[in-house]
Amino acid sequence: MNVILLDKIANLGNLGDQVVVKAGYARNYLLPQGKAVVANESNVKVFEARRAELEAKLAAELAAANQRAEKITALEAVVIASKAGDEGKLFGSVGNRDIADAVTAAGVELAKSEVRLPLGALRTTGDFEVEVQLHTEVKAVVKVSIVAEA
């Protein structure tokens, strides 16, 4: 299926690119999320008329993400207290939601879907650097310190 992208999508293309994707990916993800439109003559004309508006919106989102990244980088270590055993092993784990809630409590809005833990949840006490992806082009690192509850 041939579609016109309305947003930058990783491993696919930028705003305004006409790309060929599998029909299921287009119908189930790109079209319902508003990230693309079917590339027919009328949609191409409508897109060209709205191109400047969409580029301005994309630039505003990028600027907002950069501001949030600066705030996150400026944060000192976010402390999360969790129950732990004698050797520093946690009873349970610290996951995306816990980190997002702690950063939000520290004053910077963060959604759990923006937290990246490629090795899974954190299961020991200590200091960690967690990557946060705020936009397709903007990443930041949050310092997380997990301490045992008294």
UniProtKB/Swiss-Prot annotation:
One of its GO terms (cellular component) is ribonucleoprotein complex. InterPro entries: Ribosomal_bL9 (IPR000244), Ribosomal_bL9/RNase_H1_N (IPR009027), Ribosomal_bL9_bac/chp (IPR020594), Ribosomal_bL9_C (IPR020069), Ribosomal_bL9_C_sf (IPR036791), Ribosomal_bL9_N (IPR020070), Ribosomal_bL9_N_sf (IPR036935). SUPFAM superfamilies: L9 N-domain-like, Ribosomal protein L9 C-domain. Pfam families: Ribosomal_L9_C, Ribosomal_L9_N. Gene3D superfamilies: Ribosomal protein L9, C-terminal domain (3.10.430.100), Ribosomal protein L9, N-terminal domain (3.40.5.10). GO terms for molecular function: rRNA binding; structural constituent of ribosome. One of its GO terms (biological process) is translation. Signal peptide: none annotated. Transmembrane segments: none annotated. It comes from the Bacteria. Keywords: Ribonucleoprotein, Ribosomal protein, RNA-binding, rRNA-binding. Binds to the 23S rRNA. Belongs to the bacterial ribosomal protein bL9 family. This is Large ribosomal subunit protein bL9. It comes from Shewanella sp. (strain W3-18-1).
